[in-house]
Regions:
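Class I Rossmann-like S-adenosyl-L-methionine
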Residues: 1-170
Length: 170
């Protein structure tokens, strides 16, 4: 419904038996996919001859691509294997071969995709920083190209975490 991803994720993780380190990894993947959704969808649509619509298969592909592209501590073969296994666990047996093919294809061309991502930061910043084109155009008109790019980059950063001690709470 109308819940924010953070509250839904917090609720789901509170009901899980995951270790804290695994909870952190899940949280990083979920928020990373949300933060990079337009970019991930662009990559999916480029690799797939028949891109999946707004389906669970697309969501699973986003998770797999995010792990491969941005999470260095997860071995690439493990990301592919676990993503395909997740598809099967969710009864997407008919889609598992498709998901495997897209992820392996991305792996073969990962360096090319990441190079293009760097190029897009100046040529197609709305895709590189996963913001809708209409919003990017509005910001460019309002602030100019350079400032609009800076806003996109800033807005797509992983937020800093802060903890502070409240002396009133003891």
């Amino acid at each position: 419904g109308n819940q924010f991803a953070e509250s839904v994720l917090r609720e789901q993780l509170s009901q899980s038996n995951l270790k804290p380190i695994d909870r952190h990894m899940v949280q990083e993947m979920v928020f990373g996919v949300i933060r990079n959704m337009i970019l991930l969808d662009t990559w999916i649509d480029e690799k797939a001859t028949r891109p999946p619509g707004k389906t669970r298969a697309r969501t699973i592909l986003r998770l797999g691509l995010y792990q491969i592209a941005f999470m260095d501590r997860i071995p690439e073969h493990a990301a592919v294997h676990e993503t395909v296994a997740t598809a099967r666990d969710l009864r997407l047996h008919s889609q598992s071969g498709f998901i495997n093919a897209i992820l392996r294809g991305f792996l073969r061309e990962k360096a090319i995709f990441l190079k293009r991502l760097e190029d897009w930061k100046t040529t197609q910043a709305n895709i590189a920083y996963s913001h809708p084109n209409w919003l990017f155009k509005k910001w460019k008109k309002q602030f100019g190209d350079t400032e609009a790019n800076k806003i996109l980059q800033w807005n797509n950063q992983i937020p800093s975490s802060y903890a502070r001690w409240n002396p009133l709470c003891g």
